[in-house]
């Protein structure tokens, strides 16, 4: 199911699930098997932050076997911590290729939006980087905001936890403007109250290592009543997702 027609259908289904009226966020894991150029050419048309396509260069596995192993590792580890990279984890049961791509070639795949693997010291296949296929924004400009699957998974979790917090704490509440003085015991919520609640939730995200720079986040929160619907409140949230340590660059010099 990695032909152009099925990929198009998958992208449409993923977009539907991510819609505000569905809220059933999903991720797609697949494998492209072929030469370097074949993989680079095939991934160009996807460009989606929910798709992670893993390389398969001359391995004896069926593509669906490697895709299943990759999806299994991702499902388990991202449930534990959506912001933590899964680089270095082995694909259980996956048979490594006798011939590996060079580091420069694997970097070409990563830049194009293909997740890479290596053969570790134990002779097993291990994830090198869990990249997504998203590389350009809607205007066609290069965009690295969803380079890795960790960013996508963190965003999914934050959206879910925000929705759960609102539904648990403010079910059957009434809505008023900030000028209204809420009396003790009243089930009334205002924009300021919702702003305070999202800040408290962001502190939980911070403690869990999902985001950083809460001070800037607080300053960018927008919470306001809708102009056209008196029973709707709108929020704009711009958290800063946690990054991962992937490269350490150093330079050793003699004392001059």
Regions found by a protein language model. Give the residues of each.
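A glycine-rich, acidic short-motif signal
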Residues: 1-94
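Structured, hydrophobic secondary-structure cores that serve as assembly/anchoring elements
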Residues: 83-256
């Amino acid at each position: 199911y990695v032909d152009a027609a099925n990929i198009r259908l998958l992208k449409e289904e993923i977009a539907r699930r991510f819609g505000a009226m569905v809220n059933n966020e999903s991720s797609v894991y697949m494998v492209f098997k072929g030469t370097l150029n074949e993989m680079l050419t095939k991934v160009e048309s996807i460009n989606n932050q929910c798709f992670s396509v893993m390389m398969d260069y001359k391995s004896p596995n069926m593509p669906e076997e490697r895709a299943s192993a990759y999806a299994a590792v991702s499902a388990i580890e991202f449930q534990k911590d959506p912001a933590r990279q899964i680089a270095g984890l082995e694909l259980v049961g996956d048979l490594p290729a006798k011939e590996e791509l060079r580091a420069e070639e694997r970097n070409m795949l990563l830049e194009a939006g293909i997740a890479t693997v290596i053969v570790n010291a134990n002779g097993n296949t291990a994830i090198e980087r869990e990249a997504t296929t998203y590389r350009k924004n809607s205007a066609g400009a290069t965009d690295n905001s969803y380079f890795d699957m960790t960013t996508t998974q963190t965003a999914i979790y934050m959206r879910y936890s925000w929705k759960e917090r609102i539904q648990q704490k403010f079910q059957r509440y009434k809505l008023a403007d900030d000028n209204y003085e809420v009396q003790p015991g009243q089930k009334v919520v205002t924009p300021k109250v919702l702003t305070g609640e999202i800040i408290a939730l962001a502190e939980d995200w911070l403690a869990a290592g999902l985001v950083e720079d809460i001070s800037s986040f607080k300053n960018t929160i927008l919470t306001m009543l809708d102009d056209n619907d008196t029973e709707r409140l709108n929020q704009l949230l711009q958290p800063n997702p946690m990054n991962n340590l992937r490269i350490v660059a150093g330079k050793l010099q003699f004392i001059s």
